[in-house]
Amino acid sequence: MTSCGCLVLEKVEDHGGEAAGRGRGRLAQGGGGGGGGCGSCAGEWRSRSETMFPIYVMGSSRASSAAAARGIVDAAGDPIWEAVKSEAKSEAEKEPILSSFLYASVLSHDCLERALSFVLANRLEDPTLLATQLIDIFNDVMMNNKDIRRSIRLDAQAFKDRDPACAQYSWALLYLKGYHSVQSYRIAHVLWNQGRKVLALALQSRISEVFAVDIHPAARIGEGILLDHGTGLVIGETAIVGNWVSLMQGVTLGGTGKENGDRHPKIGQGALLGAGATILGNINVGEGAMIAAGSLVLKDVPPHSMAVGNPAKVVGYKDKEDPSLTMKHDARRDYFEHVAVSFSDDKANGSVVK
């Protein structure tokens, strides 16, 4: 407790007199009854919190991390990271019981990359692959790859813009396993391309176990990706997913058998894949296409069209909007500019009905 009565984190001693363990501590509140502290006690709060998380917070020290991260943002700074910090401070005041979690996950870090490394490592660790080891691996990957630093921000923006359940950037970072799955894949993909395939496969296995999402580290996925709900997604080794694609739960981008080589789907920019959609084989789903929930796609889907059913058939065309951005899961006749299927005559499939 600080002299001004503000809420602080206090170290909890075990029988040996050391910190009682990862994430353990108790919240104390002084007679002033304040929320998350004040300027006069900020230093004390930080000092006590750092004592409480001697190894758990940061991994190895990398002094250049913030400077490296700032290399991809313009003179205006890093607005997403600034928003995440502001949101975390506000939430710590509203929910004091989460103060230690928010400090360790966000407020103790100097850039979004470090915060993300911390969050992912503490979700993916196991008894033989420790969080501190993973933090160093993840930091090293992200700090040395401009593409991944750009992608983690564009993905966060995609979650904030397209998922009505994600009201804040910090919610994607801290709580949404769809976001965690995509960023973990991005790290595994970099490791795979560096020739560290065994480590990449170990991460893939752990990601699948923890998040129920199985993305092969060799798959190629663009930026601005929304993986909504983050459960039951499968993306095969030779699959390609373009920029700005939205994928709902239960989507499969799979092969058709035991053949080797290029055997998985290619998804165009701005496509929307509905819940439970299954797309099999080396086929193309065009830019701005929409695959309805529960559909089985075995043939190419034209750009800006909607495919529905099992097996899927093209039912219409919409030229002006990317469904991944509007998130309109809509098969009504009046939604389409052109109708490709007469709903009483499936023989018209694939051609515009005048």
Swiss-Prot record:
<dbReference type="InterPro" id="IPR018357">
    <property type="entry name" value="Hexapep_transf_CS"/>
</dbReference>
<comment type="pathway">
    <text>Amino-acid biosynthesis; L-cysteine biosynthesis; L-cysteine from L-serine: step 1/2.</text>
</comment>
<dbReference type="GO" id="GO:0006535">
    <property type="term" value="P:cysteine biosynthetic process from serine"/>
</dbReference>
<keyword id="KW-0808">Transferase</keyword>
<comment type="similarity">
    <text>Belongs to the transferase hexapeptide repeat family.</text>
</comment>
<dbReference type="Pfam" id="PF06426">
    <property type="entry name" value="SATase_N"/>
</dbReference>
<keyword id="KW-0012">Acyltransferase</keyword>
<protein>
    <recommendedName>
        <fullName>Probable serine acetyltransferase 2</fullName>
        <ecNumber>2.3.1.30</ecNumber>
    </recommendedName>
</protein>
<dbReference type="GO" id="GO:0005829">
    <property type="term" value="C:cytosol"/>
</dbReference>
<keyword id="KW-0028">Amino-acid biosynthesis</keyword>
<dbReference type="InterPro" id="IPR045304">
    <property type="entry name" value="LbH_SAT"/>
</dbReference>
<dbReference type="InterPro" id="IPR005881">
    <property type="entry name" value="Ser_O-AcTrfase"/>
</dbReference>
<dbReference type="InterPro" id="IPR010493">
    <property type="entry name" value="Ser_AcTrfase_N"/>
</dbReference>
<dbReference type="InterPro" id="IPR053376">
    <property type="entry name" value="Serine_acetyltransferase"/>
</dbReference>
<dbReference type="InterPro" id="IPR011004">
    <property type="entry name" value="Trimer_LpxA-like_sf"/>
</dbReference>
<dbReference type="InterPro" id="IPR042122">
    <property type="entry name" value="Ser_AcTrfase_N_sf"/>
</dbReference>
<dbReference type="Pfam" id="PF00132">
    <property type="entry name" value="Hexapep"/>
</dbReference>
<comment type="subunit">
    <text>Homomultimer.</text>
</comment>
<dbReference type="InterPro" id="IPR001451">
    <property type="entry name" value="Hexapep"/>
</dbReference>
<dbReference type="GO" id="GO:0009001">
    <property type="term" value="F:serine O-acetyltransferase activity"/>
</dbReference>
